[in-house]
Structure formats: structure tokens, C-alpha cells
Amino acid sequence: MSKENKTTDFGFTQVPWEEKQKKVAGVFHSVAAKYDLMNDLMSFGIHRIWKKQTIAKSGVRKGDNVLDLAGGTGDLAYKFCQMVGQQGKVILSDINSSMLEVGKEKLTNKGCVGNIEYVQANAECLPFPDNYFDCITISFGLRNVTDKEKALASMCRVLKPGGRLLVLEFSKPIIPLLSKVYDEYSFKALPFLGKIITQDAESYKYLAESIRKHPDQQTLKQMMYDAGFDNVEYQNMTGGIVALHIGYKY
């Protein structure tokens, strides 16, 4: 079946394959200005710990080339700029122009200049040379990609041999009671907060649904192997609400 006739998940709704990207773009254009505030409110600030652990496991060193993909408002990119120094380079990339503009303004105001570039790009067809990056991160972005397999293969292509991909993403809670509480919170509190803070409950309803449709820990691990990565491992965080997957290219 051609992609023109295929459907895919947009939250719990099936939409034509080619429409998902437009719908996801609408979500993030809507929430970009309040994205950081909502992250703090939704996660009670815990997202900062998840990202800190991701940075600690990235292995990024001075002189590295790093791609922060679907990097949004630049939380990871800012730290990577400090880690690579002026000898290295960080590319903050996002498919959404509104998110990228917020990230650029935020990082510029924090003094992150000289070793960072901003590139609007689709993860499924990255506009970078083969074997270019030492490290790629994608934080809370993969679940919004239409063709995840294609995106993972594209990431593998642009990684140097010996390079690593880190995927930080919502996953499947491994504690039954936590899963029930998390469901209640996600489907009731998130849209409510979205309505109050961004005047957009529907976008946060989609975000809650998209988490449930994202591949679980083992499925994503196998997808990374299938895309060409080796030694893929994952670490559950906060009882599996979030998982960090790491894969290497050899």
C-alpha cells in the first residue's frame, strides 16, 4: 500500500499519512510560546532531571559535533554548547519553525553563540552529510514523527562510526498502580492545564494520546536495531513513565 493510501495515528485518531505532519505542526505552533512553562507544570519539574541524566550519558566532549533533533526550546542544546566548546558545534534542529524560533531566542539571550546553528529539518530526511555527528539526541520528539523507522535510519546515516543516538521519550509505566494514576493525570490534568495556560486543551489531549500510541521500551529497542544501531540499551526513569534508549553506530 502506498503512503498516499495509508493512515497513521494522530493521538487516538487515524488520519491520512501525509496529514499527520501538518496536524503535529499545528499543535506545536499553538503551544511554542508556553512550551517551557507547560513542561515544568506537567512534570512538576521532573523533566529537568530526565534531561540532566540524558546529558550525563551522552558522552559529549570538547570538539564534538552534536545534533539536538526535535530540540525545540533548546534545553539540551544549551548544555551541549558548553560541553563541546568553541572547537565543536551543536545543531539545534526542529521541524517546527515556531519552536525553533523560541529556542533560538532563548539560547541567544543566554549567551549561547558561536558554536551553534539552527536548522529547520524533518527527521525523516535529515539534510546533513553521512557520518557527520558524534552524538544525536532526540528528546520527547520521536513520538510525533510520522515514519519513525525512516527517521531512525536517517539518524543512523548521519552519525559517525562510533557515534551514539540517545532517545528520551515517554514510554510505558512498569508499575500497574503507577500506570493507572498516570492515565488519570494525563487525560484529565494535561488538557485542563493546556486550556488554562495556553487556551488550547486539544493540543494537550493529543500529547497525552500520542504517548499511549508510542512504541513501548522493547519495541523501540528493536526498531533501533532494525535501523542499523548496535548495543541498544534502555533505562527506565520514574517507573517507566519515561525511558532513555541509547544505540551506537559501528
UniProtKB/Swiss-Prot annotation:
The keyword Methyltransferase applies. One of its GO terms (biological process) is methylation. It catalyses: a 2-demethylmenaquinol + S-adenosyl-L-methionine = a menaquinol + S-adenosyl-L-homocysteine + H(+); a 2-methoxy-6-(all-trans-polyprenyl)benzene-1,4-diol + S-adenosyl-L-methionine = a 5-methoxy-2-methyl-3-(all-trans-polyprenyl)benzene-1,4-diol + S-adenosyl-L-homocysteine + H(+). InterPro entries: SAM-dependent_MTases_sf, UbiE/COQ5_MeTrFase, UbiE/COQ5_MeTrFase_CS. One of its GO terms (molecular function) is demethylmenaquinone methyltransferase activity. Pathway: Quinol/quinone metabolism; menaquinone biosynthesis; menaquinol from 1,4-dihydroxy-2-naphthoate: step 2/2; Cofactor biosynthesis; ubiquinone biosynthesis. Transmembrane segments: none annotated. It comes from the Bacteria. PROSITE patterns: SAM_MT_UBIE, UBIE_1, UBIE_2. Keywords: Menaquinone biosynthesis, Methyltransferase, S-adenosyl-L-methionine, Transferase, Ubiquinone biosynthesis. The keyword Methyltransferase applies. S-adenosyl-L-methionine binds at residues 73, 94, 122-123, 139. Its EC number is 2.1.1.163, 2.1.1.201. CDD domains: AdoMet_MTases (cd02440). PANTHER family: 2-METHOXY-6-POLYPRENYL-1,4-BENZOQUINOL METHYLASE, MITOCHONDRIAL, METHYLTRANSFERASE. Belongs to the class I-like SAM-binding methyltransferase superfamily. MenG/UbiE family. Methyltransferase required for the conversion of demethylmenaquinol (DMKH2) to menaquinol (MKH2) and the conversion of 2-polyprenyl-6-methoxy-1,4-benzoquinol (DDMQH2) to 2-polyprenyl-3-methyl-6-methoxy-1,4-benzoquinol (DMQH2). This is Ubiquinone/menaquinone biosynthesis C-methyltransferase UbiE. It comes from Francisella tularensis subsp. novicida (strain U112). The lineage of its organism: Bacteria, Pseudomonadati, Pseudomonadota, Gammaproteobacteria, Thiotrichales.
